[in-house]
């Protein structure tokens, strides 16, 4: 990345608590460059974060490179995931009996 002398600055942060049956629908993070999530609690059976390959719509006539346009990552407590904010993602229904807890944030170039 060419940051043109700027540095990533965290400009928003929030807590996500997903009880059993909770989910986050597919979304992107507007007005940000870099987004991420730190996992505080990820009990066994907690739902993954699922990223969608945005190139799929542009390759309708091309044969698929793999079976899915989705990439899932199972959260582990104490881990941090970061991605570019334009990347569409979601969290399917939490099937764990305990809460899935994370702290998410957005960064801009300051």
Descriptions of predicted regions:
Residues 36-38, 97-110:
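A short hydrophobic beta-strand segment most commonly corresponding to one strand
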Residues 1-7:
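Surface-exposed helix-capping loop/turn segments at secondary-structure junctions
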